[in-house]
Amino acid sequence: RGGGFIGIGEPTAFEHEGAFFQLSDVLGVQKENGFTLNNTREIPEPASGHFVAVDMKEDIDLGLPQYSVFLCGLEARALLIRNRSVSVAVNSFGRGRAVYLSGLPYGPSQARLLRRALFWCSGKEKDFLPWTAEDPRVECHYYPSAGHLAVTNNADENVETTVFFSDGRVQQFSLSPLALVWMEV
């Protein structure tokens, strides 16, 4: 049927019949728990240019690391590898899509990564840009029934950014620390 699934940390973890992640066919990753007797796994090169990873920096904080996570499945792609373990991966399954994240503490970069994962899992990549700020530290909240846009600076420093509107317009914003700006649209 399709649909989307985002797994964080150890999603669907339950040791059963030699598998740890019970939805590994959906997630495209599995965790090695030492039951395969020295079976070494090839560490793939991270795929570049994927929609989910566009704003992701190499040093993004994903919280406590998960170890021994490897790709499984033909459609699975690693987007970030740390300590020889998959930290971010995407997978297509049937008509659906899944994203695996080894962790996700709160922060602007992590919020942007999660937002991109949600849009990709739902097949709505083309709808991502409208009502988005270029800088991940700035969030936009559009209220169509009220005709208002709220632009929030989540940083404790001044931020200059571009906001993309649904009609193709762009507007520059200079925001003071933790500022909230309302505007009619």
At which residue positions do the language-model features occur?
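A conserved amphipathic helix/loop scaffold
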Residues: 1-185
